Amino acid sequence: MNHDAAYTAIQSLIAECAGDSDRFAERLRAERIPHLSFSQVSTVEACPYRYYLQYVRGIEPEPVPAYFTKGKLLHQLIARDYSNGHGEQPAYEEELALQVSGENLAHLLNALALHRQNAWRGVEVLGVEHPFVMSLEPDLPPVVGVIDLVLKDDDGYLLVDHKTGRSFYPDDELQVAIYARYIQQAYGENICRLFYDHYRWVNHLSRIRKPAFQRVEVRAEPTRWPRDLARIRAAYAQIREIWENGAPLRCGECFRCPYRGMCRS
């Protein structure tokens, strides 16, 4: 499938999935439509062998790390709150207790409380878990992503990405650049601000010494786009080689990798 056909196929898939980002991601994987994403770029940069396991062979980590489950659940709950317009706000405790327990349940309930204290208000919600596709240049596959929250105020567009973890981890400017590029293509708008809403997993909100929530604005610098595009091209060259030649050598920071228990020695 050439890049133009892939772009058209992904556009159709987004329309068919009607904003259901989980269904969109599942269909995209199942149908193996050629594409790139920020996650693919960052994964192949971190470890080509992890890319091979995750994207070529389609293997899920075993066992699934608890932070995967918690992160996905929190994203779903936050999306539901914004989709409901912050009207009725269920506690979700009984629902969550069917899926997680112990400190993992406490982590989620505390993060949900922090979200509700710090939710974006007084802005127009344009998209929740908003899937998109865009073409960067003819020699690259279409780029796909899902923006957690697309907002608009009097000054322009606000994009929000939710991050979860035991700590507040550094942000990657490439993700910001990709999102900003999409807004420019889709809306013809150059004023675009991106925020990371970070949630740190904690057992007790009343006992913490440092914040468990942090909102950080990250700016996309247009002058850096040539460098960002070069990074995407370099990652795509690695990805093509993996698809054509098979499993590469591992070379990542294994202690942080969810696949480390499955990785060859």
Name each model-derived stretch.
Residues 33-87, 127-130, 256-259:
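Nuclease catalytic cores
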Residues 35-46, 135, 139-150, 220-229:
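An acidic intrinsically disordered interaction segment
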Residues 2-15, 80-162, 167-169, 174, ...:
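Catalytic cores of nuclease domains that cleave nucleic-acid phosphodiester backbones
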Residues 26-33, 49-61, 156-160, 233-241:
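Short amphipathic alpha-helical segments and their helix-coil junctions
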Residues 22-25, 43-54, 73-76, 80-93, ...:
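Short, compositionally biased low-complexity segments
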Residues 4-35:
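Charged, compositionally biased N-terminal leader segments and the immediate start
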Residues 184-265:
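Metal-dependent nuclease catalytic regions and adjoining charged, substrate-binding loops involved
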Residues 73, 174-182:
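Short amphipathic alpha-helical face segments that pack within enzyme cores
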